[in-house]
């Protein structure tokens, strides 16, 4: 059995097109366009690529992107002052600070400084807390994108055993909350987990986000499982995921490719969240 490949590239185009249509409707009514402030501190090459794709998407769909490229030497106090300014700016609906930040800046303090209504990354404790209490507003982009990918399979998630490999604040933890909200029985594994293979083999839905190339052997995959590979790693000049794709492809029921799986969805959901933040503001 060869798995059906879930294309994030295709779904992300659909979502971005829907967002663009809504923005066009608002601007035709004489309303302003949504505004997204994107802050990059330093010159990390991967971060520059991610920020570039986010700004490009904004331009494509009609979101006004405001760019703040700050030097590596920027002080925490300067970054916090910029966030205060953007919080107060009525033309800015979303504020995104590209992570990771330089070592001398406390990312928790920075995330918490963004007003929750403009936290389009969905990382603020207030927004994570709302998801935890089953009343989500702005949801973390990658896990939210994964839920949209799972929807395309048409499979009822209620009662399915979902196993998450990796417990980061950005993917693993909010992913667990999303899957719980969808009615799954959720297991979260991490670096202290004993017998990882045992857990992975039981997964009806497997989400892997550890950032290690081919970390999960393909023969661990349960026959017919849905495999969501969040990892993007460079190996021998190629982009590969956290799952041994070729072997997993023969065992899974559905699988996301790398590249072209989860990556494009993260950006699409950022656009979706920016529109949501804008709509909440114009409604109030």
From Swiss-Prot:
Subunit structure: Homodimer.
Residues at which NADP(+) binds: 166-168, 232
Source organism superkingdom: Bacteria
Gene from which the chain derives: folD
Keywords: Amino-acid biosynthesis, Histidine biosynthesis, Hydrolase, Methionine biosynthesis, Multifunctional enzyme, NADP, One-carbon metabolism, Oxidoreductase, Purine biosynthesis
UniProt GO cellular component terms: cytosol
Protein EC: 1.5.1.5, 3.5.4.9
Pathway: One-carbon metabolism; tetrahydrofolate interconversion
Protein purpose: Catalyzes the oxidation of 5,10-methylenetetrahydrofolate to 5,10-methenyltetrahydrofolate and then the hydrolysis of 5,10-methenyltetrahydrofolate to 10-formyltetrahydrofolate.
Pfam families: THF_DHG_CYH, THF_DHG_CYH_C
Keyword Iron-sulfur: no
GO BP annotation list: L-histidine biosynthetic process; methionine biosynthetic process; purine nucleotide biosynthetic process; tetrahydrofolate interconversion
Family: Belongs to the tetrahydrofolate dehydrogenase/cyclohydrolase family.
Catalysed conversion reaction: (6R)-5,10-methylene-5,6,7,8-tetrahydrofolate + NADP(+) = (6R)-5,10-methenyltetrahydrofolate + NADPH; (6R)-5,10-methenyltetrahydrofolate + H2O = (6R)-10-formyltetrahydrofolate + H(+)
GO MF annotations in UniProt: methenyltetrahydrofolate cyclohydrolase activity; methylenetetrahydrofolate dehydrogenase (NADP+) activity
Protein name, as recorded: Bifunctional protein FolD
